[in-house]
Amino acid sequence: MELYLDTANVAEVERLAHIFPIAGVTTNPSIIAASKESIWEVLPRLQKAIGDEGILFAQTMSRDAQGMVEEAKRLRDAIPGIVVKIPVTSEGLAAIKILKKEGITTLGTAVYSAAQGLLAALAGAKYVAPYVNRVDAQGGDGIRTVQELQALLEMHAPESMVLAASFKTPRQALDCLLAGCESITLPLDVAQQMLNTPAVESAIEKFEHDWNAAFGTTHL
């Protein structure tokens, strides 16, 4: 199972990389834009924050296949080993096929259906990213989409894997993992919610109170 952070906040990645067992960082154009930094400046800093073994994802902006391929090569040249996110449109599928031949690893993004995700995998995407909460927001069932996509990949494209995205709650993320999802990417607030449970702090304070009452210290 692989856990990613969905952010371009370098300081938070540096902090959380010491806490969470993260495999890397995912970004998208909106996340990069919110950082107010050039993508060519922030990507190297993110890679440094996650280390050489961490996997970094960044997305193309062009709408046509040739433009996507050219931008993917620029990203690869800037960050060797980067995974390039390609929207799963007709042009995107064409780009994924070309990039597969070029040896550039891709993720099929903006996936709203299992069929769409399967096409990305068959075209050559190593990762496929269904948008869990956004599917829910459109009246669909995000977790069901993940389940169906996971089953399809296991049967027809076992070299590809689901990297579920677009979460608003830890429960959504856990349900994806229970559905057999191999990897997820979490926004910072959801990652923090997984750890910051008020009951935990109350339990620790009770332990300290009882220990201090008996031994006059809060240390061993």
Curated annotation (Swiss-Prot):
Pfam families: TAL_FSA (PF00923). It comes from the Bacteria. Its EC number is 4.1.2.-. Signal peptide: none annotated. SUPFAM superfamilies: Aldolase (SSF51569). GO terms for cellular component: cytoplasm. It catalyses: beta-D-fructose 6-phosphate = dihydroxyacetone + D-glyceraldehyde 3-phosphate. Pathway: Carbohydrate metabolism; fructose metabolism. It is found in: Cytoplasm. One of its GO terms (molecular function) is fructose 6-phosphate aldolase activity. NCBIfam families: fsa_talC_mipB, PRK12653.1. Catalyzes the reversible formation of fructose 6-phosphate from dihydroxyacetone and D-glyceraldehyde 3-phosphate via an aldolization reaction. PANTHER family: FRUCTOSE-6-PHOSPHATE ALDOLASE 1-RELATED (PTHR10683:SF40), TRANSALDOLASE (PTHR10683). Belongs to the transaldolase family. Type 3A subfamily. This is Fructose-6-phosphate aldolase 2. It comes from Escherichia coli O157:H7.
